[in-house]
Curated annotation (Swiss-Prot):
Protein name in the entry: Holliday junction branch migration complex subunit RuvB
Disulfide bonds: none
Residue ranges, annotated region (Small ATPAse domain (RuvB-S)): 192-262
Gene that specifies this protein: ruvB
Glycoprotein in keyword set: no
GO molecular function per UniProt: ATP binding; ATP hydrolysis activity; four-way junction DNA binding; four-way junction helicase activity
Length: 354
């Protein structure tokens, strides 16, 4: 089967990526084990439930699954759930770790029938490793080279049927041949405040922390639609409630704790405000190219595109246009500025008013 406290606050408390191995272990403890326990992503859950039921009925390996979407939405959790629901073992790795064809071959040849191989950041597979993967996905076979130079020969090895679950935050970087070999492709979306409140309530129970519904909803509203962030904020608010109160997480206690953490009522932290203020003040509201924006705020281009922008765009504070990034009317209002005359209204907030 699947092999698999209080922490110092990470530098960016609303980062959607794990801050440390300790935090990853903490996440595993809170992770739902079965599909029925998984909150949100109703469409994806419904599809996987049917596909897994059919595969179990036929006693076959589940078709290969590609999960994509912003970080922290539950791709790794779903991979573990798939293995558990199918009653098989899970082997986990990531694209950057598989540097040589032999690394992948060693994993594949050790899989038992119908096992799940989970490759995180699959878009970062090297081309030479990806080539080895194609026949493994299609025919459950791999070709490996024995020997060197003129004496080298190719040997075909048969594999047990298996399921590859690939996860990526950048589906557009997958090559077409690799993408086409996944029979099940699912996009994970940001969660609603109500869904996140259910996750926060469940996590609080596992942590044996007292929380009322309004306290859970206040944390959920500021979690940027992301369960990983919601659970991290819950732990920090729990710490605050134990020191400053009687340990019960109320709306007022959550509001005070999150204000201390510099997380505002729409889930923005210092980095979000820094990006939007750069667009507004340094570039006159845009358009501004992502490379110029990265230089202005001292961040990597990938950080802006993968971590900061998705939520700002989803919330209607930033637009991505062919000419560059542009601040919306909602961004001007958020900072108490008058928007330029003739600017279209914002798209509204994902989670409503706090």
């Amino acid at each position: 089967m699947i092999e698999t406290d209080k922490l110092a606050a990470p530098a960016r408390v609303i980062a959607a990526t794990p801050a440390s191995s300790q935090e990853e272990a903490f996440e595993r403890a809170l992770r739902p084990k079965l599909l029925d326990e998984y909150v949100g992503q109703e469409k994806v859950r419904g599809q996987l439930d049917i596909f897994m039921h059919a595969a179990r009925k036929r006693r076959e390996a589940l078709d290969h699954v590609l999960l994509f979407g912003p970080p922290g939405l539950g791709k790794t959790t779903l991979a573990h759930i798939i293995a558990r629901e199918m009653g098989v073992s899970l082997r986990q790795t990531s694209g950057p770790v598989l540097e040589r064809p032999g690394d992948l071959a060693a994993l594949l040849t050790n899989l038992e029938a119908n096992d799940v191989l989970f490759i995180d950041e699959i878009h970062r597979l090297s081309p030479v490793v990806e080539e080895i993967l194609y026949p493994a996905l299609e025919d459950y076979q791999i070709d490996i080279m024995i020997g060197e130079g003129p004496a080298a020969r190719s040997v075909k090895l048969d594999l047990q049927p298996f399921t590859l679950v690939g996860a990526t935050t950048r589906a557009g970087m997958l090559t077409n041949p690799l993408r086409d070999r996944f029979g099940i492709v699912a996009r994970l979306e940001f969660y609603t405040a109500e869904e996140l409140a259910r996750i926060v309530t469940r996590s609080a129970q596992l942590l044996q922390a007292r929380i009322d519904p309004q306290g859970a909803l206040e944390i959920a509203r500021r979690a940027r639609g992301t369960p990983r962030i919601a659970n991290r904020l819950l732990r920090r608010v729990r710490d605050y409630a134990e020191v400053k109160g009687d340990g019960t997480i109320t709306r007022e206690m959550a509001d005070a704790a999150l204000a201390m953490l510099d997380v505002d009522r729409v889930g923005f932290d210092l980095m979000d405000r820094k990006l939007l203020e750069a667009v507004l003040h340094k570039f006159g509201g845009g358009p501004v190219g992502v490379d110029n924006l990265a230089a202005a705020i001292g961040e990597e281009r990938d950080t802006i595109e993968d971590v900061l922008e998705p939520y700002l765009i989803q919330q209607g504070y930033l637009q991505r246009t062919p000419r560059g990034r542009v601040a919306t009317a909602a961004a001007y209002r958020h900072f108490g500025l008058a928007s330029p005359q003739g600017m279209a209204g914002d798209a509204g907030e994902l989670f409503g008013d706090a």
